[in-house]
């Protein structure tokens, strides 16, 4: 039998590891090496191809555990092979566990898939870093399926499949205690009354510590507790929150010494479901913290190494990642600020996925467990001990797993503390159960300096910094909180400080997968008396940000500087525009930082490293927090001058918007940049500007900027250009004159704030300095002050200065080489173009459109009256043109009396700069009408500038104006000569456009042949073959009555419903009274079932009935739909009667189909039970299986499960030419050939495989309910009166016959159900576990596989016979040849 067993050895497919029957795992999940993307794809495709080659008739479901939010790479690969791939999370907030709800879902789906048949394979896969969750889910599945019962042994067995270092690499903490706790929940599913356990609200009364640890040689510790979990008061929101946090500055926090035998700490916290209980040791300053860990490993604190991180190894934060951070800010969901839980900011216990991350970011507390003992601060250790518990709380039982921490035998200075047991008391809201004794779980994890934090299924463990080191850069581990802010800062675990008056070092952001995505800088006030203000650190090498990087805006508790206090710097207009949605509805308080949702706020705290180059902040200063974006690389930000990283908005004083930027240059247009895309002009560089002049005018409101910046720039830049690309130059349209604005008064500009420092346009994105205010507007009768001369135009090869000073407001410079006549200076350019010009760039430049005058963008056109006092009026009085806009929409200005507008500005870019031109301006035309408040009063675009006095040219950039310009072209003004030609009937031939050489058409093209073409009389042709033109007068005469008739029709029903109803009535083609009479007579010969369904769909509703009843006019004037509804309203309960008619039409067909299916079930059950041949085949399979399994636990079987039939095809012989199914056919053909045709006894097997008992039950229920409704309608229609007598009579006859059919059908249905159950019992199966559909499908698959194997055996036998005959013939030939050789002498 050993040889027989070796002959039929079942080898798992290549690339897979067999766990148990039909459950496999990809073998590369157990490897410590990470495959490259190309190698990984090739490996997966190879495994999939091997599976399909060897198991072509099987189905595969792959459960993948990964860390990606989107679809995994294995999903895209295996989906091409028709395999089902289910992506599951590989962790929960960094913990190698999933929520109990998710665990239950995975287990149920896996069990359902495996129970469908033996041809279903379940393959498990995990991505890099997710091996602990894969091991846990495999152990849970094996326990759930009942194959294993011991949780510890099952989990150990799976972890032993991989190297020990694999778990240490992927998890800095030992996950086994927490995983064992949840495995016990799975194993207890048959013991507890309900599973999964319901999450019931309880009250955590107190925590009792029976062992007090010694921290830092003080003989005890100062514990505080934090509890995380879903809020039981908000059942709809299952997001984990801080349910309880011990206030740091209160009488509750006290020091407990080891002399205390028992410590009881009252909590009184309402909890529900998965809960994390965190114990933290507080330092003497009541600010710094140490995480308390109960473990059975060596006693080591969670101190981290104080060696600084090499900043040269860090890389900058990409522009795309910064855009993701900005997108996160724009979609934050804030917590409810009224709840106490919003005062606490939970932080997530980060876990690294590689040793490289651990070495690079030692500030992460969870990563310190991988540090070697040489890197740890052992001098401060003295028998330290700590605790962290995870609870799954229900009102039935409490299971808590904890581990005990012993002293470090190498560095302990006191006697060894004996291991003690911890007790936690959990009570419901009113009833308090007895305390639960916690038994320690000891799990040894080699090569780690500390052990497990118990991880929950629905929350995370916050991280507290533990090393009191000096800050470096902009991040500090802990700062003492001022007394005034202690209440709001009680739940914070770490803070951040901004260095002042020191040369800072570059900011390094940890590229960890678990860091949160927030950046906030807030510094305390320099002096205690004034309120706290925001100080933006003047850091030059710290925060270099790209030109195209957008600025993040966060609302903080601060007060904007007053006008007397100049600000440090100003944010860019683009930042203000993106900031508007954030700062519009936020409170100007630092409390907003404490309201972030857990997925952002519960971030890994970043602990600062020591640095001698920075000053530590006094303890009176308020602690600030630094949030680091999650899963983003480090971001070095460079700037040669002061850079404002955060744009701040408060409610106490409005934010100061940026002042007006300098005007555009004639051939240099700067476009707004978007995340790394740089666009600029390609012709010239920026011209040098003038020295600073008077301060700018009062700025406009920020909403004016934010509401119009995008609409105005959308007409300038249609799409962002990649770096290095040169866009096609657009045709420069002629500039329009400025719109008129009445000048009523002029107020001098207010004293502006201190202008910001100049920033090189090639490195940073702040707005360039603003120009001085424009001169006061010109009022008739008022002297005009002299206008300063314009600056010289920029030379083509001139370079722009590095730092442009604020320029004066010059008129638009001319194109180089153009000669012009001197005119008064035009007004300053529009706000939009100023904003556009404030984004300098270094990439190639494009030829710009001409600079429009002021007030031409939607920025100002939306609020024209906001700058009345700052506009410049021209000295000439031409008529005012209408107001227009360069954006996609036009906002009209309020009507006002005519005012002297400006003359048209000069054309720019009309020809090459080298060509000299003379442009003369026309005299002022006569005054025109004032502008109207309508966007439709836009005149067409002027295209030509002549010396004659034309009207003031105005234009728009819409398609309508382009079509208008085309209509005024010379071609459009020609007389249409062909308009009077009579249209002729076309000849629909196939046109030959090119005559081939030697063809008839080539000969026709010759001159001699062309002269032979006869002349065509066009007039005769038109008289004979013209298209008949209808007489317009007759057409109008014919249309008048129809229009009048249409106007007379009264439509009360919805137009779309009325049209659909008329379409339905046209299909019926029957008068409405006859239709209703057939319905009352239950006559199914006139209307079919589909038409009746349409009639039911168009039954009038109650509202429509009330509308028609309220109509008092002539009902003949109603539409067809209204008249149809009126006709249906004459029949009482018309919709119910129509449904009865539909049921009557379909009743016989439904009964016949249902009877046929029920009879098939009875027949197939009888055939299977009475088949003797099938019984002999099953007995042969049993003997064959016992022979294979002799001497094993599977041997000596008295029977086998039905799904074992499908495994016969899976076991292959060693030569891979024969399976156990082929061997069975061979044995039966040799020993029992009479049973080979047993499939002929099972004729109803295939029809029965198409039947679903659930569908039959639904059909039976529909028939039963339909008969009940018929009976109710019969009772009700008896009282309807004489109009329903025929209906009542016909319905009574139908009901009598239908009830008889229903009774016989119910009896047949009951019999078929018993037959289906008896078929499962015949094979020893439970009808609930193995329903009728599974039994029939398994038998049918076995029969087809048996027939295919038997046919293959017959073909193989034929081939062997032919081969034997050929061998025999060869032997005969050889024998004859041998005889001839012997006969020769």
Swiss-Prot record:
Top-rank taxon: Eukaryota
Positions annotated as active site in the UniProt record: 126
SUPFAM superfamilies hit by this protein: (Phosphotyrosine protein) phosphatases II (SSF52799), Formin homology 2 domain (FH2 domain) (SSF101447)
Biased composition (Polar residues): 349-358, 448-470, 483-510
Record's compositionally biased regions (Low complexity): 702-718, 855-867, 933-942
Keyword Transport: no
Biased segments, Pro residues type: 654-665, 689-701, 727-758, 766-795, 802-815, 895-906, 921-932
Position of the signal peptide: none
Gene Ontology terms, MF aspect: phosphoprotein phosphatase activity
The FH2 domain, residue ranges: 974-1372
Phosphatase tensin-type domain mapped to chain residues: 9-193
C2 tensin-type domain boundaries: 199-358
Name of the protein in question: Formin-like protein 7
Species lineage: Eukaryota, Viridiplantae, Streptophyta, Embryophyta, Tracheophyta
């Amino acid at each position: 039998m050993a040889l027989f067993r070796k002959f039929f050895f079942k080898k798992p497919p290549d690339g897979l590891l067999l766990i148990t029957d039909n459950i496999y795992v990809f073998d590369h999940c157990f490897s410590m090496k990470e495959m490259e993307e190309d190698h990984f794809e090739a490996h997966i495709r190879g495994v999939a191809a091997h599976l399909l080659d060897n198991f072509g008739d099987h189905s595969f479901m792959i459960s993948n555990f990964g860390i990606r939010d989107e679809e995994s790479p294995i999903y895209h690969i295996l989906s091409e092979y028709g395999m089902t791939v289910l992506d599951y999370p590989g962790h929960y907030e960094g913990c190698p566990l999933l929520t109990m709800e998710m665990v239950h879902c995975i287990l149920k789906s896996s069990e359902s898939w495996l129970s469908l048949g033996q041809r279903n394979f379940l393959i498990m896969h995990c991505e890099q870093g997710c091996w602990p969750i894969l091991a846990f889910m495999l152990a849970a599945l094996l326990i759930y399926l009942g194959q294993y019962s011991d949780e510890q042994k099952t989990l150990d067995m799976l972890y032993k499949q991989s190297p020990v270092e694999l778990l240490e690499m992927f998890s800095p903490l030992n996950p086994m205690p927490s995983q064992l706790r949840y495995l016990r929940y799975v194993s207890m599913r048959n013991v507890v009354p309900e599973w999964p356990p319901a999450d019931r609200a309880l009250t955590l009364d107190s925590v009792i510590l029976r062992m007090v640890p010694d921290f830092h040689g003080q003989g005890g510790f100062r514990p505080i507790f934090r509890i995380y979990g879903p809020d039981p008061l908000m059942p709809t929101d299952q997001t984990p929150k801080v349910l309880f946090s011990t206030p740091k500055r209160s009488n509750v926090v006290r020091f407990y010494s080891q002399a205390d035998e028992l410590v009881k700490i009252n909590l009184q916290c309402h909890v529900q479901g998965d809960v994390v209980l965190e114990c933290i040791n507080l330092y003497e300053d009541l600010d710094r913290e140490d995480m308390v860990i109960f473990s059975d490993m060596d006693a080591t604190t969670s101190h981290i190494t104080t060696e600084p991180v090499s900043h040269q190894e860090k890389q900058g934060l990409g522009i795309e990642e910064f855009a993701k951070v900005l997108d996160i800010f724009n979609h934050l969901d804030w917590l409810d600020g009224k709840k106490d839980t919003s005062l606490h900011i939970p932080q997530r216990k980060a876990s690294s996925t590689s040793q490289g991350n651990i070495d690079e970011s030692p500030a992460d507390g969870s990563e310190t467990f991988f540090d070697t003992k040489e890197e740890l601060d052992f001098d401060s250790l003295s028998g330290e001990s700590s605790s962290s518990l995870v609870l799954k709380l229900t009102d039935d039982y409490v299971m808590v797993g904890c581990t005990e921490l012993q002293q470090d035998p190498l560095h302990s200075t006191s006697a060894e503390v004996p291991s003690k047991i911890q007790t936690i008391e959990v009570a419901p809201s009113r009833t308090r159960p007895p305390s639960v004794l916690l038994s320690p779980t000891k799990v040894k994890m080699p090569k780690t300096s500390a052990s497990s934090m118990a991880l929950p299924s629905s929350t995370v463990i916050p991280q507290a910094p533990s090393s009191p080191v000096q800050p470096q850069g902009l991040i500090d581990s802990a700062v003492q909180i001022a007394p005034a802010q202690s209440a709001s800062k009680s739940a914070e675990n770490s803070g951040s400080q901004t260095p002042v008056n020191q040369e800072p070092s570059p900011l390094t952001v940890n590229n960890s997968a678990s860091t949160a995505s927030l950046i906030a800088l807030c510094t305390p006030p320099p002096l205690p008396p004034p309120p706290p203000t925001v100080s933006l650190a003047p850091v030059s090498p710290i925060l270099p940000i790209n030109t195209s990087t957008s600025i993040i805006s966060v609302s903080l508790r601060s007060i904007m500087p007053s006008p007397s206090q100049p600000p440090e710097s100003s944010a860019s207009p683009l930042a203000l525009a993106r900031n508007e949605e954030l700062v519009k509805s936020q409170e100007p308080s630092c409390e907003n930082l404490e309201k972030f949702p857990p997925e952002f706020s519960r971030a890994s705290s970043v602990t600062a490293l020591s640095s001698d180059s920075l000053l530590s902040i006094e303890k009176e200063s308020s602690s600030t927090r630094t949030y680091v974006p999650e899963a983003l690389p480090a971001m070095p930000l460079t700037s040669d001058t002061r850079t404002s990283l955060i744009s701040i908005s408060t409610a106490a004083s409005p934010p100061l918007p940026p002042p007006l930027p300098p005007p555009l240059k004639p051939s240099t247009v700067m476009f707004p940049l978007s995340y790394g895309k740089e666009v600029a002009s390609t012709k010239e560089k920026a011209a040098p500007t003038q020295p600073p002049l008077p301060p700018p005018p009062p700025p406009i409101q920020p909403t004016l900027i934010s509401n119009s910046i995008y609409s105005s720039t959308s007409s300038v830049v249609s799409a962002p250009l990649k770096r290095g690309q040169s866009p096609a130059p657009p045709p420069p349209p002629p500039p329009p004159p400025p719109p008129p604005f009445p000048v009523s008064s002029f107020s001098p500009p207010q004293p502006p704030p201190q202008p910001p420092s100049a920033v090189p346009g090639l490195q940073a994105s702040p707005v360039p300095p603003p120009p001085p205010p424009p001169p006061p507007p010109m009022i008739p009768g008022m002297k005009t002050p002299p206008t300063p001369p314009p600056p010289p135009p920029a030379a083509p090869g001139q370079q722009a200065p590095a730092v442009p000073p604020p320029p004066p407001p010059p008129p638009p410079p001319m194109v180089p080489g153009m000669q012009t006549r001197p005119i008064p200076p035009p007004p300053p350019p529009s706000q939009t173009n100023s904003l556009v010009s404030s984004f300098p760039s270094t990439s190639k430049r494009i030829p710009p459109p001409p600079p429009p005058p002021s007030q031409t963008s939607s920025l100002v056109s939306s609020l024209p009256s906001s700058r009345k006092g700052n506009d410049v009026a021209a000295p000439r009085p031409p008529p005012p043109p209408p107001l227009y806009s360069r954006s996609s929409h036009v906002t009209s200005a309020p009507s006002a009396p005519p005012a002297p507008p400006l003359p048209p500005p000069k054309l720019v870019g009309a020809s090459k700069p080298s060509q000299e031109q003379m442009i003369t301006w026309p005299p002022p035309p006569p005054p025109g009408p004032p502008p109207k408040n309508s966007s439709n009063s836009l005149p067409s675009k002027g295209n030509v500038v002549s010396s004659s006095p034309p009207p003031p040219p105005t234009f728009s950039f819409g398609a309508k104006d382009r079509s208008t310009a085309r209509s005024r072209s010379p071609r459009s003004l020609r007389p249409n000569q062909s308009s009077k030609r009579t249209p002729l009937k076309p000849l629909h031939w196939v046109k030959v456009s090119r005559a081939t050489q030697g063809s008839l058409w080539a000969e026709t093209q010759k001159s001699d042949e062309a002269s032979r073409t006869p002349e065509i009389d066009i007039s005769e042709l038109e008289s004979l073959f013209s298209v008949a033109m209808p007489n317009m007068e007759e057409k109008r005469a014919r249309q008048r009555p129809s229009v009048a008739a249409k106007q007379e029709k009264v439509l009360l029903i919805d137009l779309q419903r009325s049209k659909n109803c008329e379409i339905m009535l046209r299909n019926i083609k029957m008068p409405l009274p006859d239709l209703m009479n057939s319905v009352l007579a239950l006559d199914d010969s006139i209307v079919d079932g589909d038409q009746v369904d349409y009639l039911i769909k168009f039954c009038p509703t109650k509202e429509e009935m009330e509308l028609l009843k309220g109509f008092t006019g002539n009902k003949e004037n109603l539409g067809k739909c209204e008249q149809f509804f009126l006709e249906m309203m004459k029949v009482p309960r018309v919709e119910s009667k129509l449904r009865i008619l539909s049921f009557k039409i379909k009743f016989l067909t439904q009964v016949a189909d249902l009877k046929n299916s029920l009879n098939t079930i009875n027949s197939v059950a009888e055939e299977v039970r009475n088949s003797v041949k099938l019984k002999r085949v099953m007995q042969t399979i049993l003997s064959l299986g016992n022979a294979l399994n002799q001497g094993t636990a599977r041997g000596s079987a008295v029977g086998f499960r039905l799904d074992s039939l499908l495994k016969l095809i899976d076991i292959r012989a060693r030569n891979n030419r024969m399976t156990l199914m082929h061997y069975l056919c061979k044995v039966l053909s040799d020993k029992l050939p009479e049973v080979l045709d047993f499939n002929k006894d099972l004729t109803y097997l295939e029809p029965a495989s198409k039947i679903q008992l659930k569908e039959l039950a639904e059909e039976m229920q529909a028939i039963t309910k339909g008969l009940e409704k018929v009976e109710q309608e019969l009772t009700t229609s008896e009282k309807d009166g004489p109009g329903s007598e025929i209906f009542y009579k016909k319905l009574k006859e139908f009901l009598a016959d239908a009830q008889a059919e229903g009774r016989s059908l119910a009896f047949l249905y009951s019999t078929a159900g018993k037959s289906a159950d008896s078929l499962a019992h015949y094979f020893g199966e439970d009808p609930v576990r193995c329903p009728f559909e599974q039994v029939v499908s398994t038998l049918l698959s076995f029969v087809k596989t048996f027939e295919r194997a038997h046919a293959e055996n017959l073909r193989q036998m034929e081939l062997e016979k032919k081969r034997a005959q050929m061998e025999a013939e060869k032997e005969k030939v050889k024998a004859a040849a041998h005889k001839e050789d012997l006969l020769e002498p």
